[in-house]
Amino acid sequence: MERRLKTLMDGLTFGEGPRWYQNKFYFSDFYSHKVYALDLNGNYDVIVEVPNQPSGLGWLPDGTMLIVSMKDRKLLSFKDNVLEEMADLSELAGFHCNDMVVDVHGNAYIGNFGFNTYAGEEVKSTNLILVRPGEEPCVAADDLMFPNGTVITEDGKTLIVGETYAAVSYTHLRAHET
């Protein structure tokens, strides 16, 4: 059987934060400030525009979409076509926020650059931020070198965080949260 590649979309500037949710492929295109959804037939829609660049995506148990707003270091919620601030991450993030993973309980784990890469600042460690529904943001893990590519294993017991500037992955065993 011959397989052929088919372009479903072009013109993207920087695709980020890919997630599969309810039979659609969602992702941020952060330089165009848009969040897209692509269906199984190759049709796509702009879901929302985020003024300060979208990055990581996830969902609360009730279906509310969560979006990391990079430049202003905020966690946003998007439901019923309303984009709102859910949490201000700026006190815990050293620079722009980026990737995120959300567990089945709605706990969001959010990475950040830790330093201003564009100004040539020295590489330095930062925090992985945790936002639980209805609570203030807190530090889930510290001393990480640009936490990114975070995933939770299928059984929900292990959080794996890629550290871009350390060239390693950090594994954290999580207790089951209710």
Could you tell me what each predicted segment is?
Residues 1-3, 122:
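Blade/loop signatures of beta-propeller domains
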Residues 4-8, 43-48, 84-89, 136-141:
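A short beta-strand motif characteristic of beta-propeller blades
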Residues 9-22, 50-69, 74, 91-115, ...:
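Beta-rich, blade/repeat-based domains predominating
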Residues 29-39:
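Beta-propeller domains
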Residues 31, 71, 118-125, 164-165:
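Short, solvent-exposed loop/turn segments at conserved positions within beta-propeller repeat blades
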Residues 34-36, 74-76, 127-129, 168-170:
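A short loop-to-beta-strand structural motif that recurs across blades of beta-propeller domains
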Residues 39-42, 79-82, 132-135:
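Short loop/turn segments that connect beta-strands within beta-propeller blades
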Residues 171-178:
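Conserved small/polar residues in nucleotide/adenosyl-binding loops
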